[in-house]
Design a protein with these regions (language model features):
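Acetyl-CoA-dependent GNAT
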Residues: 3-5, 9-80, 91-93, 97, ...
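Short hydrophobic/aromatic beta-strand or adjacent loop that forms the aromatic wall/cage
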Residues: 42, 149-156
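Conserved acyl-donor/pantetheine-binding loop and adjacent beta-alpha core of acyl/acetyltransferases
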Residues: 56-69, 134-149
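Hydrophobic packing within well-folded, soluble alpha/beta domains
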Residues: 77, 90-94, 106, 121, ...
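Active-site acidic-Proline motif in GNAT/NAT acetyltransferases
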Residues: 78-80, 84, 112-113
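Short glycine/proline-centered loop/turn elements that form peptide/ligand docking sites
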Residues: 87, 91, 113-117, 133-140
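Conserved GNAT acetyl-CoA-binding A-motif
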Residues: 98-109
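Conserved catalytic-core motifs of GNAT/GCN5-like acyltransferases
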Residues: 109-110, 122, 127-147, 154
Length: 161
C-alpha cells in the first residue's frame, strides 16, 4: 500500500530527509530556500509520501516577470514519481498558502520548452499572460561539474477566489 501524499511548509528539521531524498549536491538548494524562508522572502513547500520527500516548490512573495502576484517557482518532482498527482498537489497547496495571505492570484513561470509542465498548469486553470522574461543560473551536477543555464520563461497566472 502506498503512503498518503501530503504537502506542507518545509521546516529546518526536514533538511536531512530532503538532502537524502531529493539531493541537490553542491547546489545546497534546500538549505538556501530554508534560509530565504526564514528571511520572509519565500515559503518552501515539500510534498511527502510517508516520511519520504517526493517534490518541492517555492512561493516567491515578490513575483518576477512583471507579475503582480506571488510566484510558484522551482517546482520539482523527480521523473520516477511524476504523473502521480504530486505536482498538482504542490500547486494547489501553493494556491492555499497565497490565499491565506490575502493574495488575489498566483503566478507560475514555465520555460517555453517545458510543454508538459505548461499543459499541467493550463489544465489547472492558469492562463498565459503574454509576459515573458529570461533568467540565467548556475547549477552543479552529481560529479560537481558546473552548468550555466538560460531559461526563456512565460508567465501564467490564476486568480484566486
Amino acid at each position: 500500500m502506498t503512503a498518503a501524499l501530503t504537502v506542507r511548509v518545509a521546516e529546518d528539521a526536514d533538511l536531512p530527509a530532503l538532502d537524502r531524498g531529493l539531493p541537490t549536491g553542491r547546489n545546497d538548494a534546500h538549505r538556501a530556500f530554508l534560509a530565504r524562508q526564514a528571511a520572509g522572502e519565500v515559503t518552501y513547500l515539500v510534498a511527502w509520501r510517508g516520511d519520504a520527500p517526493v517534490g518541492v516548490g517555492v512561493v516567491r512573495w515578490t513575483g518576477r516577470g512583471g507579475s503582480p502576484y506571488p510566484e510558484l517557482s522551482n517546482l520539482h518532482v523527480p521523473p520516477p514519481v511524476q504523473s502521480q498527482g504530486i505536482g498538482t498537489a504542490i500547486v494547489h497547496f501553493a494556491e492555499d498558502v497565497a490565499r491565506s495571505r490575502g493574495r488575489a492570484g498566483l503566478a507560475i513561470g514555465v520555460d517555453e520548452d517545458n510543454v508538459r509542465a505548461a499543459a499541467l498548469y493550463e489544465r489547472l486553470g492558469y492562463v498565459d499572460t503574454g509576459r515573458r522574461w529570461t533568467g540565467s543560473y548556475t547549477w552543479y551536477d552529481e560529479s560537481g561539474a558546473e552548468h550555466a543555464e538560460t531559461e526563456h520563461v512565460r508567465v501564467l497566472t490564476l486568480k484566486l477566489g
